[in-house]
């Protein structure tokens, strides 16, 4: 990670939809500095960067990953690209925060974890529903064989 113990981590966001805005705000509230944004459309990314106060727009994920000053990449893109993007981010030796769902199948999820472990970076998936009572009940049902 590029951030020293005295500096906040630098973050880039992949995704310009509603959840991208949430990730920008959450990163800032956690003390990170949001330095860049990439989206599926350069025009939309520029408009969102201006609205969200993000200083740099990258043309694509590859350009973002070439930046040595980015410590963490938040993936807030469409679900079907989470796995390929998270693996690319980990391979670039940047930490990954991935919106749910982590992946569309268990093999892809395993590949994401393997890539992060091989690169020595953190991979986290946002899943705040795990604290909901209904999720605890479903988990208990699964463990008991009821599901």
What label would you give each PLM region?
Residues 1-52:
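N-terminal Rossmann-like dinucleotide-binding module
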Residues 15-24, 65-73, 119-121:
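A broad helix-preferring feature
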Residues 18, 43-44, 80-83, 104, ...:
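Short alpha-helical
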Residues 23, 45, 85, 112, ...:
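Aromatic/hydrophobic pocket-lining residues that form π-stacking "cages" and hydrophobic walls in ligand
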Residues 30, 92, 118-119:
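Structured helix-beta-strand junction loops
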Residues 35, 58, 97, 122-124:
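Structural detector of well-ordered beta-strand residues that form the stable sheet scaffold
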Residues 52-115:
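Beta-loop-alpha module in the N-terminal Rossmann-like domain of NAD(P)-dependent dehydrogenases
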Residues 103-147:
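A contiguous active-site-proximal alpha/beta segment in oxidoreductase catalytic domains
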């Amino acid at each position: 990670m590029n951030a020293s113990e005295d500096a906040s981590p630098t973050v880039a966001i992949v995704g310009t939809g509603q959840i991208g805005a949430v990730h920008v705000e959450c990163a800032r509230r956690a003390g990170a500095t949001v330095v860049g944004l990439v989206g599926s459309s350069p025009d939309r990314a520029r408009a969102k960067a201006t609205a969200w106060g993000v200083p740099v727009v990258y043309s694509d994920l590859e350009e973002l990953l070439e930046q040595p000053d980015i410590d963490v990449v938040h993936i807030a893109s469409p679900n079907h690209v989470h796995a390929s993007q998270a693996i690319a981010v980990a391979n670039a030796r940047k930490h990954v925060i991935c919106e749910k769902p982590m992946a569309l199948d268990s093999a892809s999820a395993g590949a994401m974890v393997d890539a992060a472990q091989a690169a020595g970076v953190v991979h986290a998936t946002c899943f705040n529903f795990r604290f909901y009572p209904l999720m605890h009940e479903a988990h208990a049902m699964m463990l008991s064989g009821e599901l």
